[in-house]
Amino acid sequence: MAANISIPEFYNGQSIFLTGGTGFIGKVLVEKLLRSCPGIENVYMLCRSKKGKNINERFEEITSSPVFNLLREQNPQALNKIILIEGDIAMLEMGISKTDQEILKDKVTIVMHSAATVSFTEPLKVAVNTNLRSVRELICLAKDMKNLQSFVHISTAFANWFELNVKEEVYPSIYDPDDIIELANRLPDETLNKITPIFLGKHVNTYTFTKSLAENLVKREKNLPTIIIKPSMVGASVSEPHVGWIDSLMGPARYIYYTTQGIFRSVYLPNRSAAIDFVPVDFTTNLTIAAPWKCEIDKRTNSSMTYPYIYFSATGSVNQLLWKDYFKNSRDFGRTIPPKNAIWYPQIRLHKTKIGHHIDVALTHFIPAYLNDLVAKIKGQKAIFDE
Protein backbone atom coordinates (compact mmCIF):
# COMPACT_ATOMS: atom_id res chain seq x y z
CA MET A 1 0.00 0.00 0.00
CA ALA A 2 1.36 3.40 -1.00
CA ALA A 3 2.17 5.75 1.86
CA ASN A 4 0.27 8.58 0.18
CA ILE A 5 -2.99 6.70 -0.32
CA SER A 6 -6.07 8.72 0.63
CA ILE A 7 -8.57 7.60 3.24
CA PRO A 8 -11.36 6.94 0.69
CA GLU A 9 -8.90 4.91 -1.40
CA PHE A 10 -7.91 2.90 1.67
CA TYR A 11 -11.55 1.96 2.25
CA ASN A 12 -12.05 0.67 -1.30
CA GLY A 13 -13.13 -2.96 -1.02
CA GLN A 14 -13.18 -2.91 2.79
CA SER A 15 -15.94 -4.65 4.75
CA ILE A 16 -16.73 -3.17 8.15
CA PHE A 17 -18.36 -4.89 11.10
CA LEU A 18 -19.98 -2.18 13.21
CA THR A 19 -21.64 -2.45 16.59
CA GLY A 20 -23.65 0.45 17.95
CA GLY A 21 -24.71 1.51 14.47
CA THR A 22 -28.16 2.44 15.76
CA GLY A 23 -26.75 4.87 18.34
CA PHE A 24 -25.85 8.55 18.08
CA ILE A 25 -22.19 8.09 17.15
CA GLY A 26 -22.92 4.95 15.13
CA LYS A 27 -25.42 6.59 12.79
CA VAL A 28 -23.03 9.44 12.00
CA LEU A 29 -20.23 6.91 11.49
CA VAL A 30 -22.26 4.81 9.03
CA GLU A 31 -23.38 7.89 7.09
CA LYS A 32 -19.85 9.26 6.82
CA LEU A 33 -18.38 5.93 5.74
CA LEU A 34 -20.95 5.37 3.00
CA ARG A 35 -20.93 8.95 1.74
CA SER A 36 -17.20 9.75 1.85
CA CYS A 37 -15.83 6.28 1.08
CA PRO A 38 -18.04 5.08 -1.80
CA GLY A 39 -15.72 2.18 -2.58
CA ILE A 40 -16.61 0.36 0.64
CA GLU A 41 -17.77 -3.18 -0.03
CA ASN A 42 -20.22 -3.60 2.85
CA VAL A 43 -21.05 -2.45 6.36
CA TYR A 44 -22.19 -5.37 8.49
CA MET A 45 -24.21 -3.78 11.28
CA LEU A 46 -25.14 -5.55 14.50
CA CYS A 47 -28.77 -4.91 15.36
CA ARG A 48 -31.28 -6.32 17.83
CA SER A 49 -35.04 -6.35 18.06
CA LYS A 50 -36.27 -3.64 20.40
CA LYS A 51 -39.59 -2.32 21.67
CA GLY A 52 -41.61 -4.77 19.61
CA LYS A 53 -39.77 -3.98 16.37
CA ASN A 54 -37.66 -6.55 14.53
CA ILE A 55 -34.29 -5.65 13.06
CA ASN A 56 -35.69 -4.87 9.61
CA GLU A 57 -38.30 -2.50 11.05
CA ARG A 58 -35.63 -0.81 13.13
CA PHE A 59 -33.41 -0.50 10.08
CA GLU A 60 -36.16 1.25 8.13
CA GLU A 61 -36.74 3.58 11.05
CA ILE A 62 -33.05 4.38 11.46
CA THR A 63 -32.30 4.94 7.77
CA SER A 64 -35.27 7.30 7.48
CA SER A 65 -33.53 9.59 9.96
CA PRO A 66 -32.48 13.07 8.72
CA VAL A 67 -28.88 12.02 9.36
CA PHE A 68 -29.02 10.15 6.04
CA ASN A 69 -30.65 12.95 4.00
CA LEU A 70 -27.42 14.04 2.33
CA LEU A 71 -26.46 10.45 1.53
CA ARG A 72 -29.89 9.80 0.02
CA GLU A 73 -29.47 12.88 -2.19
CA GLN A 74 -25.95 12.02 -3.36
CA ASN A 75 -25.87 8.23 -3.44
CA PRO A 76 -29.11 6.54 -2.30
CA GLN A 77 -27.91 3.11 -3.45
CA ALA A 78 -25.16 3.21 -0.83
CA LEU A 79 -27.65 2.24 1.87
CA ASN A 80 -27.92 -1.14 0.16
CA LYS A 81 -24.37 -1.86 1.34
CA ILE A 82 -25.61 -2.15 4.93
CA ILE A 83 -26.11 -5.80 5.87
CA LEU A 84 -27.89 -6.44 9.16
CA ILE A 85 -26.48 -8.99 11.59
CA GLU A 86 -28.97 -9.92 14.28
CA GLY A 87 -27.49 -10.00 17.74
CA ASP A 88 -27.14 -8.36 21.14
CA ILE A 89 -23.80 -7.27 22.58
CA ALA A 90 -24.90 -8.14 26.12
CA MET A 91 -25.24 -11.82 25.20
CA LEU A 92 -22.59 -14.51 24.90
CA GLU A 93 -21.12 -14.52 21.39
CA MET A 94 -23.11 -11.28 21.07
CA GLY A 95 -26.13 -13.38 20.22
CA ILE A 96 -24.84 -13.85 16.67
CA SER A 97 -25.80 -17.06 14.90
CA LYS A 98 -23.08 -19.50 13.84
CA THR A 99 -23.94 -18.86 10.20
CA ASP A 100 -23.51 -15.10 10.56
CA GLN A 101 -20.29 -15.59 12.53
CA GLU A 102 -18.82 -17.52 9.61
CA ILE A 103 -19.82 -14.74 7.22
CA LEU A 104 -18.11 -12.15 9.42
CA LYS A 105 -14.97 -14.27 9.77
CA ASP A 106 -14.76 -14.62 6.01
CA LYS A 107 -15.65 -11.08 4.91
CA VAL A 108 -14.77 -8.48 7.56
CA THR A 109 -11.54 -6.49 7.32
CA ILE A 110 -12.20 -3.77 9.93
CA VAL A 111 -14.10 -4.00 13.22
CA MET A 112 -15.57 -0.85 14.80
CA HIS A 113 -17.03 -1.41 18.25
CA SER A 114 -19.18 1.56 19.21
CA ALA A 115 -21.96 -0.15 21.17
CA ALA A 116 -22.14 0.46 24.92
CA THR A 117 -24.45 1.43 27.71
CA VAL A 118 -23.61 5.00 28.69
CA SER A 119 -25.86 5.07 31.74
CA PHE A 120 -24.03 6.04 34.92
CA THR A 121 -26.58 4.22 37.09
CA GLU A 122 -26.51 0.83 35.39
CA PRO A 123 -26.26 -2.17 37.76
CA LEU A 124 -22.80 -3.72 37.67
CA LYS A 125 -23.95 -6.93 35.97
CA VAL A 126 -25.61 -5.04 33.12
CA ALA A 127 -22.62 -2.72 32.67
CA VAL A 128 -20.15 -5.63 32.76
CA ASN A 129 -22.00 -7.70 30.17
CA THR A 130 -22.61 -4.73 27.88
CA ASN A 131 -19.37 -2.78 28.14
CA LEU A 132 -16.85 -5.44 29.12
CA ARG A 133 -17.89 -8.96 28.20
CA SER A 134 -18.99 -7.74 24.77
CA VAL A 135 -15.41 -6.65 24.08
CA ARG A 136 -14.09 -10.08 25.02
CA GLU A 137 -16.68 -11.78 22.81
CA LEU A 138 -15.87 -9.48 19.91
CA ILE A 139 -12.13 -10.06 20.30
CA CYS A 140 -12.71 -13.82 20.17
CA LEU A 141 -14.62 -13.37 16.93
CA ALA A 142 -12.04 -10.98 15.47
CA LYS A 143 -9.20 -13.45 16.06
CA ASP A 144 -10.81 -15.76 13.53
CA MET A 145 -11.35 -13.08 10.88
CA LYS A 146 -9.19 -14.08 7.94
CA ASN A 147 -8.40 -10.61 6.63
CA LEU A 148 -8.60 -8.39 9.70
CA GLN A 149 -6.67 -5.13 9.34
CA SER A 150 -7.90 -3.12 12.34
CA PHE A 151 -9.95 -3.60 15.50
CA VAL A 152 -11.31 -0.24 16.67
CA HIS A 153 -12.75 0.05 20.17
CA ILE A 154 -14.53 3.28 21.10
CA SER A 155 -13.96 3.89 24.80
CA THR A 156 -14.14 7.15 26.77
CA ALA A 157 -11.70 9.87 27.78
CA PHE A 158 -13.03 9.47 31.33
CA ALA A 159 -12.10 5.80 31.78
CA ASN A 160 -9.47 6.94 34.30
CA TRP A 161 -10.83 10.38 35.11
CA PHE A 162 -9.18 10.44 38.55
CA GLU A 163 -5.65 10.52 37.09
CA LEU A 164 -4.13 14.00 37.31
CA ASN A 165 -2.73 14.06 33.77
CA VAL A 166 -4.34 11.42 31.60
CA LYS A 167 -2.00 10.18 28.87
CA GLU A 168 -2.65 8.24 25.68
CA GLU A 169 -2.13 4.90 27.31
CA VAL A 170 -4.09 2.15 29.02
CA TYR A 171 -3.93 2.38 32.80
CA PRO A 172 -3.67 -1.04 34.45
CA SER A 173 -6.56 -2.16 36.62
CA ILE A 174 -6.12 -3.92 39.94
CA TYR A 175 -8.73 -6.41 38.73
CA ASP A 176 -8.52 -9.04 36.04
CA PRO A 177 -11.34 -8.32 33.55
CA ASP A 178 -12.14 -12.04 33.26
CA ASP A 179 -12.57 -12.30 37.04
CA ILE A 180 -15.00 -9.38 37.08
CA ILE A 181 -17.00 -10.92 34.22
CA GLU A 182 -17.23 -14.26 36.04
CA LEU A 183 -18.10 -12.62 39.35
CA ALA A 184 -20.79 -10.40 37.85
CA ASN A 185 -22.50 -13.39 36.27
CA ARG A 186 -22.14 -15.75 39.21
CA LEU A 187 -23.21 -13.70 42.23
CA PRO A 188 -26.89 -12.99 42.94
CA ASP A 189 -27.90 -9.51 41.82
CA GLU A 190 -28.70 -8.38 45.37
CA THR A 191 -25.28 -9.41 46.66
CA LEU A 192 -23.50 -7.91 43.67
CA ASN A 193 -25.28 -4.58 44.07
CA LYS A 194 -24.27 -4.40 47.73
CA ILE A 195 -20.57 -4.93 47.04
CA THR A 196 -20.41 -2.83 43.86
CA PRO A 197 -18.99 0.26 45.68
CA ILE A 198 -16.07 -1.86 46.89
CA PHE A 199 -15.13 -2.80 43.35
CA LEU A 200 -15.60 0.69 41.93
CA GLY A 201 -12.96 2.25 44.16
CA LYS A 202 -12.08 5.63 42.64
CA HIS A 203 -14.59 5.13 39.85
CA VAL A 204 -17.80 7.02 40.57
CA ASN A 205 -20.00 4.74 38.46
CA THR A 206 -20.13 1.40 36.68
CA TYR A 207 -19.68 3.10 33.29
CA THR A 208 -16.09 4.31 33.77
CA PHE A 209 -15.24 1.17 35.74
CA THR A 210 -16.24 -1.21 32.94
CA LYS A 211 -14.78 1.03 30.24
CA SER A 212 -11.41 1.03 32.00
CA LEU A 213 -11.47 -2.76 32.29
CA ALA A 214 -12.43 -3.08 28.62
CA GLU A 215 -9.36 -1.07 27.63
CA ASN A 216 -7.25 -3.56 29.58
CA LEU A 217 -8.87 -6.39 27.63
CA VAL A 218 -7.95 -4.72 24.36
CA LYS A 219 -4.39 -3.99 25.47
CA ARG A 220 -3.57 -7.60 26.31
CA GLU A 221 -4.22 -8.68 22.71
CA LYS A 222 -0.70 -7.98 21.48
CA ASN A 223 -1.18 -9.78 18.17
CA LEU A 224 -4.31 -7.92 17.11
CA PRO A 225 -4.04 -4.55 15.29
CA THR A 226 -6.06 -2.75 17.96
CA ILE A 227 -7.03 0.92 18.18
CA ILE A 228 -8.73 2.67 21.09
CA ILE A 229 -10.65 5.90 20.46
CA LYS A 230 -11.30 7.90 23.63
CA PRO A 231 -13.85 10.70 23.14
CA SER A 232 -14.92 13.02 25.93
CA MET A 233 -18.58 14.09 26.03
CA VAL A 234 -19.89 13.97 22.47
CA GLY A 235 -22.13 16.79 21.28
CA ALA A 236 -23.82 18.07 18.14
CA SER A 237 -21.96 18.08 14.83
CA VAL A 238 -19.99 21.02 13.49
CA SER A 239 -20.68 20.34 9.83
CA GLU A 240 -21.47 16.71 8.99
CA PRO A 241 -23.92 15.36 8.14
CA HIS A 242 -25.57 18.73 8.88
CA VAL A 243 -24.56 21.73 10.98
CA GLY A 244 -25.63 21.17 14.58
CA TRP A 245 -27.14 17.73 14.01
CA ILE A 246 -28.03 15.72 17.10
CA ASP A 247 -30.77 13.24 17.91
CA SER A 248 -30.01 12.53 21.54
CA LEU A 249 -30.43 14.48 24.77
CA MET A 250 -27.41 12.83 26.32
CA GLY A 251 -24.52 14.82 27.73
CA PRO A 252 -24.17 18.53 26.93
CA ALA A 253 -27.29 18.62 24.73
CA ARG A 254 -29.51 17.94 27.75
CA TYR A 255 -28.30 21.09 29.53
CA ILE A 256 -28.73 23.26 26.45
CA TYR A 257 -32.23 21.94 25.79
CA TYR A 258 -33.59 22.45 29.29
CA THR A 259 -31.86 25.80 29.78
CA THR A 260 -33.29 27.27 26.57
CA GLN A 261 -36.73 26.02 27.60
CA GLY A 262 -36.47 27.84 30.90
CA ILE A 263 -36.71 24.61 32.89
CA PHE A 264 -33.09 24.34 34.03
CA ARG A 265 -32.50 27.38 36.25
CA SER A 266 -29.94 26.50 38.92
CA VAL A 267 -26.49 24.92 38.81
CA TYR A 268 -24.12 23.94 41.60
CA LEU A 269 -20.76 25.12 40.27
CA PRO A 270 -18.21 25.70 43.05
CA ASN A 271 -15.34 26.16 40.58
CA ARG A 272 -16.24 28.95 38.15
CA SER A 273 -13.11 28.33 36.08
CA ALA A 274 -13.88 24.63 35.48
CA ALA A 275 -13.83 23.69 31.80
CA ILE A 276 -16.34 21.47 30.04
CA ASP A 277 -14.72 18.94 27.73
CA PHE A 278 -16.91 17.85 24.84
CA VAL A 279 -16.35 17.34 21.15
CA PRO A 280 -18.59 17.45 18.07
CA VAL A 281 -19.74 14.03 16.96
CA ASP A 282 -18.28 14.45 13.47
CA PHE A 283 -14.82 15.05 14.97
CA THR A 284 -15.04 11.70 16.76
CA THR A 285 -16.37 9.77 13.76
CA ASN A 286 -13.76 11.27 11.43
CA LEU A 287 -11.03 10.17 13.84
CA THR A 288 -12.55 6.69 14.05
CA ILE A 289 -12.47 6.40 10.27
CA ALA A 290 -8.96 7.83 9.90
CA ALA A 291 -7.36 5.67 12.59
CA PRO A 292 -7.42 2.33 10.66
CA TRP A 293 -5.98 4.11 7.62
CA LYS A 294 -3.10 5.46 9.75
CA CYS A 295 -2.59 2.06 11.36
CA GLU A 296 -2.35 0.29 8.00
CA ILE A 297 0.12 2.82 6.58
CA ASP A 298 2.30 2.47 9.68
CA LYS A 299 2.26 -1.32 9.34
CA ARG A 300 3.74 -0.96 5.86
CA THR A 301 6.60 1.23 7.07
CA ASN A 302 7.24 -0.03 10.60
CA SER A 303 7.69 -3.72 11.38
CA SER A 304 7.99 -3.17 15.15
CA MET A 305 4.65 -1.52 15.84
CA THR A 306 3.06 -1.91 19.26
CA TYR A 307 -0.67 -1.99 19.92
CA PRO A 308 -3.05 -0.58 20.82
CA TYR A 309 -2.95 2.74 19.04
CA ILE A 310 -4.67 5.20 21.37
CA TYR A 311 -6.30 8.46 20.29
CA PHE A 312 -8.14 10.99 22.40
CA SER A 313 -11.00 12.95 20.87
CA ALA A 314 -11.21 15.74 23.41
CA THR A 315 -10.68 19.45 23.97
CA GLY A 316 -8.05 19.09 26.66
CA SER A 317 -6.34 22.41 27.30
CA VAL A 318 -6.92 23.71 23.76
CA ASN A 319 -9.80 26.07 22.93
CA GLN A 320 -11.49 25.43 26.25
CA LEU A 321 -15.07 26.38 27.08
CA LEU A 322 -15.84 27.08 30.72
CA TRP A 323 -18.95 25.64 32.34
CA LYS A 324 -20.08 29.11 33.42
CA ASP A 325 -19.90 30.40 29.84
CA TYR A 326 -21.58 27.25 28.56
CA PHE A 327 -24.66 27.80 30.71
CA LYS A 328 -24.77 31.54 30.05
CA ASN A 329 -24.47 30.98 26.30
CA SER A 330 -27.33 28.47 26.48
CA ARG A 331 -29.45 30.99 28.38
CA ASP A 332 -28.70 33.78 25.90
CA PHE A 333 -29.47 31.50 22.97
CA GLY A 334 -32.83 30.63 24.50
CA ARG A 335 -33.64 34.30 24.88
CA THR A 336 -32.58 35.21 21.34
CA ILE A 337 -34.22 32.26 19.57
CA PRO A 338 -36.73 30.82 22.05
CA PRO A 339 -38.04 27.31 21.34
CA LYS A 340 -41.74 26.95 20.53
CA ASN A 341 -42.35 24.77 23.56
CA ALA A 342 -40.52 27.01 26.07
CA ILE A 343 -41.94 26.75 29.58
CA TRP A 344 -40.42 29.86 31.15
CA TYR A 345 -38.18 32.79 30.32
CA PRO A 346 -34.61 31.40 30.27
CA GLN A 347 -32.61 32.18 33.40
CA ILE A 348 -29.68 30.40 35.00
CA ARG A 349 -27.95 30.98 38.31
CA LEU A 350 -24.61 29.46 39.25
CA HIS A 351 -24.13 28.63 42.93
CA LYS A 352 -20.88 28.07 44.77
CA THR A 353 -22.65 26.38 47.69
CA LYS A 354 -24.95 23.35 47.73
CA ILE A 355 -27.38 25.00 50.14
CA GLY A 356 -27.89 27.93 47.80
CA HIS A 357 -28.42 25.56 44.89
CA HIS A 358 -30.92 23.40 46.80
CA ILE A 359 -32.96 26.44 47.85
CA ASP A 360 -32.98 27.73 44.28
CA VAL A 361 -34.06 24.32 42.95
CA ALA A 362 -36.95 24.22 45.43
CA LEU A 363 -38.11 27.73 44.55
CA THR A 364 -37.61 27.67 40.79
CA HIS A 365 -37.92 23.96 39.90
CA PHE A 366 -40.10 21.93 42.24
CA ILE A 367 -42.65 24.47 43.44
CA PRO A 368 -43.42 25.93 39.98
CA ALA A 369 -43.55 22.42 38.50
CA TYR A 370 -45.93 21.24 41.21
CA LEU A 371 -48.22 24.26 40.76
CA ASN A 372 -48.16 23.85 36.98
CA ASP A 373 -49.19 20.20 37.23
CA LEU A 374 -51.84 21.00 39.83
CA VAL A 375 -53.49 23.51 37.50
CA ALA A 376 -53.23 21.03 34.62
CA LYS A 377 -54.96 18.31 36.64
CA ILE A 378 -57.74 20.69 37.70
CA LYS A 379 -58.32 21.46 34.03
CA GLY A 380 -58.34 17.76 33.22
CA GLN A 381 -55.08 18.00 31.30
CA LYS A 382 -52.02 15.76 31.47
CA ALA A 383 -49.43 16.69 34.09
CA ILE A 384 -46.06 17.45 32.50
CA PHE A 385 -43.63 17.26 35.42
CA ASP A 386 -45.35 14.63 37.55
CA GLU A 387 -42.72 12.01 36.81
Per-segment meaning from a language model:
Residues 36-40, 141-149, 221-225, 294-304, ...:
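Secondary-structure transition/capping motifs at alpha-helix termini
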Residues 105, 110-114, 121-129, 133-209, ...:
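Conserved Rossmann-fold NAD(P)-dependent oxidoreductase catalytic core, especially the SDR/UDP-sugar
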Residues 60-75, 166-197, 345-350, 365-381:
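Alpha-helical "lid/cap" subdomains adjacent to substrate-binding clefts that gate access
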Residues 130, 276-279, 321:
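Residue-level signal for the nucleotide or nucleotide-sugar donor/cofactor binding architecture
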